[in-house]
Amino acid sequence: MSITKSISTRRMSKGFTLIELVTVIVILGILAVFTLPRFANVTEQAHDASIQGVKGALASSVAIVHAQWVANGQPTADPNRDNLVGFGRGDIDVSAFGWPTSTNGSNNPSMDAIRCVEVWYGILQSSAPIVDTAGNVDYRVSAPGGDCVYTYNRDNSGSNIIYDADTGEITGNIF
C-alpha cells in the first residue's frame, strides 16, 4: 500500500497547477508595471551622461591646447599662431590668447560653423562623436554670435555644448 501511495504522490507533484501559473504571471506583471518607468528613465540618464562626458572631453582638450601654447613660449609678439607645435597633428590654429580656432589658418576667435567642426575634429580623439552643420549626426553645429554651439541630436532634447573661442570657456545646457 505504501508503494502505491508513493507512486501516486509523485505523479501528483509533477508540474505547476493553473492557479500557480496565473499567480506567477500576475506577480511578473506587477513587477513590470513598477520597474518599467525606472528603466525607461535610464535611457534619458544615459543621454545626459554622454553629453556630460563629451563636454568634459572638449573642455580638457581645449585646456591642453592652451597649455601647449603656453609651453611653447607664448604669448609672444610672434603673429604666427598657425599649426600649434606639440599638439595632435600639428594643424591646430589658436587665437591671440591661445584658444583653438581652426585647422585652416584662421586665428579669428569669432567662429563660424565650419571652423567649429574643424576645432572639434582637430582637438578630440578620432573616436569622438560625429558633428556637422546638417544631417543625421550626433551633434549639429551652429555658431550664433561667434560661439560654437554643438546641439545633441540623438534625443531631440535641445541639449548643447557651447565653446567660446575668446575665453576658452566650455558651457552647456542639458534638458
Language-model regions, residue ranges each:
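N-terminal leader/signal peptides at the extreme start of proteins
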Residues: 1-16
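N-terminal signal-anchor/signal peptide hydrophobic helix marking the start
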Residues: 14-24
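Alpha-helical hydrophobic helix detector
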Residues: 22-37
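Conserved catalytic segment of histidine kinase HATPase_c domains, centered on the N-box/ATP-lid region
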Residues: 43
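Membrane-proximal N-terminal amphipathic helix
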Residues: 46-73
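Periplasmic/extracellular, small/polar-rich flexible segments of pilin-like filament-forming proteins
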Residues: 67-175
